[in-house]
């Protein structure tokens, strides 16, 4: 995997396609570029797609976290992503963010608003941040220490790949019959990838999202985010409250929301063909026709 020098660290990335339309893809917390392995090959070669890996994730450098995790703050990740674009000679591009990648995109929009064009968000952490839930650090500590716990935790990020009755406390998640061999292999690899994450990811991310929630500093600058936004949300999402997303879309000046009743947090691995179609239509200036309909999803699953 290629790496680019960004400040004092190296950031890893993968590229697909070529052309004047460039999309920077930013994964979510506990993630890596592999989260898009099923979707990226379905994208047209006329889109240049750059899938970046956060510091502390994947093949990127993993600096020792500061005591307050400030070097793993959302603003720091945003600066890394902008630095990667500089290193690759990309003056202007579109943005895509999944989950916590969404709030990283928002930081980039307020820092360099003229640099970015359209924004596609998938089940995003919003500019409001996220409250630190009771017991959350304990759960993350267990996931870090125990691969089985990590498997169970990540399964809730792609719930349609698993039998619903096994996604409960005390049960080991079991793949559903509809989960393809490729999806099963990828999910297993994504769990393996969590074994190398920095503590700045495991623990710095939730602490910084809680700081964002308490300060509302980024949310107070949403008036700067005038870029066209399309926000996708799977209604089976265990991780991001729908009311957060609805509130964000209401306050942004140029945003629309599409709901998908039969998808969870990660359309990119749950229904990659549907995700690739929406991604392609949006960034090639076509209005998405998916509309979250059951019929459309049924065909594409």
Question: What spans do the regions from the language model cover?
Answer:
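Catalytic active-site module of serine/aspartate enzymes centered on a nucleophile-bearing elbow/loop
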Residues: 254-301
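Conserved alpha/beta-hydrolase "nucleophile elbow" surrounding the catalytic nucleophile
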Residues: 27-29, 93, 97-102, 234
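Active-site loop/oxyanion-hole signature of alpha/beta-hydrolase fold enzymes
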Residues: 51-100, 277
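Conserved HGGG/HGGXW glycine-rich cap/lid loop of the alpha/beta-hydrolase fold
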Residues: 9-65
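Short beta-strand/loop motif that positions the catalytic acidic residue
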Residues: 225, 231-233
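Conserved alpha/beta-hydrolase catalytic His-Asp/Glu region
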Residues: 129-134, 151-223
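Acidic catalytic loop of the alpha/beta-hydrolase fold
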Residues: 236-240
């Amino acid at each position: 995997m290629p790496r680019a020098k960004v400040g004092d660290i190296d950031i890893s990335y993968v590229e697909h396609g070529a052309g004047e339309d460039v999309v920077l893809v930013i994964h979510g917390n506990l993630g890596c570029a592999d989260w898009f392995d099923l979707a990226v090959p379905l994208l047209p070669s006329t889109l240049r797609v750059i899938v970046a890996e956060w510091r502390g994730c994947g093949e990127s450098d993993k600096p020792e976290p500061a005591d307050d995790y400030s070097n793993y703050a959302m603003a720091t990740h945003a600066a890394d992503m902008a630095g990667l674009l500089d290193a690759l000679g990309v003056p202007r591009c579109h943005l895509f963010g999944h989950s916590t990648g969404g709030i990283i995109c928002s930081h980039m929009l307020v820092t360099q608003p003229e640099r970015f064009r359209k924004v596609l968000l998938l089940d995003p952490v919003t500019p409001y941040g996220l409250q630190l839930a009771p017991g959350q650090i304990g759960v993350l500590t267990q996931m870090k220490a125990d691969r089985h716990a990590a498997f169970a935790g990540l399964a809730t990020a792609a719930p349609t790949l698993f039998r619903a009755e096994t996604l409960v406390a005390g049960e080991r998640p079991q793949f559903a019959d509809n989960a393809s061999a490729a999806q099963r292999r990828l999910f297993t690899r994504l769990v393996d990838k969590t074994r190398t994450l920095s503590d700045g990811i495991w623990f710095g991310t939730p602490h910084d999202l809680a700081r964002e929630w308490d300060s509302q500093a980024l949310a107070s600058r949403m008036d700067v985010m005038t870029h066209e936004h399309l926000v996708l949300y799977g209604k089976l999402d265990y991780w991001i409250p729908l009311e957060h997303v609805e509130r964000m879309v209401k306050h942004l000046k140029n945003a629309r929301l599409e709901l998908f009743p039969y998808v969870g947090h990660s359309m990119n691995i749950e229904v990659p063909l549907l995700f690739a179609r929406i991604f392609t239509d949006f960034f090639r200036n076509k209005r998405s026709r998916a509309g979250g309909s059951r019929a459309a999803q049924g065909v594409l699953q």
